From Swiss-Prot:
UniProt binding sites for L-tyrosine: 34, 166, 170
Designated gene of the protein: tyrS
NCBIfam families assigned: tyrS
SMART domains: S4 (SM00363)
First-listed, main subcellular location of the protein, grouped into a coarse class: cytoplasm
Similarity field: Belongs to the class-I aminoacyl-tRNA synthetase family. TyrS type 1 subfamily.
Entry GO terms, CC: cytosol
Source organism per UniProt: Lactiplantibacillus plantarum (strain ATCC BAA-793 / NCIMB 8826 / WCFS1)
Ranges spanned by the short sequence motif 'KMSKS' region, renumbered to the chain: 228-232
GO BP term, example: tyrosyl-tRNA aminoacylation
Name of the protein this chain belongs to: Tyrosine--tRNA ligase
Known function: Catalyzes the attachment of tyrosine to tRNA(Tyr) in a two-step reaction: tyrosine is first activated by ATP to form Tyr-AMP and then transferred to the acceptor end of tRNA(Tyr).
EC number: 6.1.1.1
Length: 418
């Protein structure tokens, strides 16, 4: 199946500058294409992942993707999707963020000869102000630029000349890559349509109307409840494991709504059409098994964090469900118990009642602690404690780093042994 037909089946195409021309181009040859990302932070979140999943599909189909990490445009600020001016970053911040994003890109695409990361600072920084105005500014109509959605949406609240010129800079990126690397396709989110078409227009003006330069945008991904995909009550879901642990990442996907899961399987996995159709059927016939959600979580977590991260996430999930926490490693505990109530405790042995009340503050009183212990409601590191005279050794398990306390079936507490 042609890559364009595959993307249409997945619901991943919003607009194309020339559908027939692009389909013909991708059928007959390997195409170089690009997507840009400005280094406004040092990590992508799952919202950023959407266009780069498309880029990855092109790579797997034999094409050559380029990622433009915008060291130049990132110093300016893209007005797309913003209702106010971006705060300008220092060049040191931009460089730090570039390095973080580039590392993530190589993890997703591999150090492959058919994948390239480039920095638009390398060519934009060489253009003088006079050259910019003469060679490029002269080719852009202010009237046309004002009518682009990305600018028009900002006119009431105001837009600086700096951000106003952003679409010219992005157009220069496309022109440079077209000339230097024979890049013929730019992809981006739906809000990038104005910037992308400005680039194809510039190429056609300077290289001729028969120049094969195309644009493709991806729809805004909405959840079944109408809200924007990628946001949670706890904020963004990051690709950086220091910000969002692989377990939390896995849990985000496994907890998706039945109404959304098939759409996400199409967008975020490389499963075949037949396998996705089969999983879609299980959502209808056996939704309680959540097979589609589990497969989604496995596939996306492996793509971003690797196979071992999936194994660890499933170990944590099983341990928390069954209460068998003894099988967990210290690293898995750190991931799985992030966000549960916790406290630092000493490594000294102590009476269990005093430890629960004084050291951890887990129990409100000694009377309550004794009652819970006698009733078998307290488990320490997965083992039931029934003796109120028992002594706890905080350094006895999990490399002497943690003590896991559970009351009843769901109330967990994590003690960090210092």
């Amino acid at each position: 199946m042609n890559i364009i037909d595959d993307l249409k089946w997945r619901g991943a195409i919003n607009q194309q500058t020339d559908e027939a021309g692009l389909k013909e181009l991708t059928e007959n040859q390997s195409v170089s294409l690009y997507c840009g990302i400005d280094p406004t932070g040092d990590s992508m979140h799952i919202g950023h992942l959407i266009p780069f999943m498309i880029l990855k599909r092109f790579q797997l189909a034999g094409h050559h993707p380029y990622v433009v990490v915008g060291g130049g445009t990132g110093a300016i600020g893209d007005p797309s999707g913003k209702n106010s001016e971006r705060k300008l970053q220092t060049m040191d911040q931009v460089k730090h963020n570039q390095d973080g994003l580039s590392a993530q890109m190589y993890k997703l695409f591999g150090h492959d000869e058919n994948f390239s990361i480039v920095n638009n600072y390398d060519w934009l920084s060489k253009i003088s102000l006079l050259d910019f105005l003469r060679d490029y500014g002269k080719l852009f109509s202010v009237n046309t630029m004002l009518n682009k959605e990305v600018v028009a949406s900002r006119l009431e609240v105001g837009i600086s000349y700096t951000e106003f010129t952003y679409q010219i800079l992005q157009s220069v990126d496309f022109l440079h890559l077209y000339r230097a690397e024979h890049v013929q396709l730019q992809i981006g989110g739906a809000d990038q349509w104005g910037n992308i078409t400005a680039g194809t227009d510039l190429i056609h003006r300077l290289e001729g109307n028969d120049a094969k330069a195309y644009g493709l945008t991806i729809p805004l991904l909405l959840k079944a409840d109408g809200t924007k995909f990628g946001k949670t009550a706890g904020g963004a879901v990051w690709l950086n494991p220091e910000r969002t642990s692989p377990y939390e990442f896995y849990q985000f996907w496994i907890n998706q709504d039945d109404r959304d899961v098939v759409k996400y399987l199409k967008y975020f996995t490389f499963l075949s059409h037949e396998e996705i159709d089969r999983l879609a059927e299980t959502v209808k016939t056996a939704p309680e098994k959540r097979e589609a959600q589990r497969r989604l979580a496995e596939e996306v977590t492996e793509f971003v964090h690797g196979k071992q991260a999936v194994v660890e996430a499933e170990n944590i999930t099983k341990a928390l469900f069954t209460g068998d926490v003894q099988s967990l490693t210290a690293d898995e505990i750190e991931q799985g118990f992030k966000g549960v109530p916790s406290a630092d405790v000493s490594a000294e042995k102590q009476n269990i009642v005093l430890w629960l009340v004084d050291a951890t503050k887990f129990e409100p009183s000694r009377r309550q602690a004794r009652e819970d212990i006698k009733n078998g409601a307290i488990r320490i590191n997965g083992e039931k404690v029934t003796d109120v005279e028992a002594e706890i050794d905080p350094s006895a398990a999990f490399n002497g780093k943690f003590v896991i306390v559970r009351r009843g079936k769901k109330r967990y507490f994590l003690a960090h042994v210092k």
